Swiss-Prot record:
This is Large ribosomal subunit protein uL22. GO terms for molecular function: rRNA binding; structural constituent of ribosome. GO terms for cellular component: cytosolic large ribosomal subunit. GO terms for biological process: translation. NCBIfam families: rplV_bact (TIGR01044).
Amino acid sequence: MPETHAILRGVRLSVDKGRLVADLIRGKKVDQALNILNFTQKKAAGIIRKVLESAIANAEHNDSADIDELKVKTIHVEQGTTLKRSAARAKGRGNRISKPTCHVYVTVGN
């Protein structure tokens, strides 16, 4: 069975926080991975759960895959563009605030 993937780009989440959750489900069966994500109390868990559900739906629709056989083959979180903002400080100065984004890649297969 071919591998199927789903990608979510530009998520307002730091890469380190996303990788923390991605490491929990790498290599697991999809039903077990969804169960882990449902009970993980992190912002990244909800985001990664949606991408995983999209990959499962892609496999079911495009490849007619059996959901019970699917496993999370690869999952990785890469750094995206950083949004740069400025914050006013005392005496007419300003500081830079960086708001990181990331890209989430999920591949499912047998």
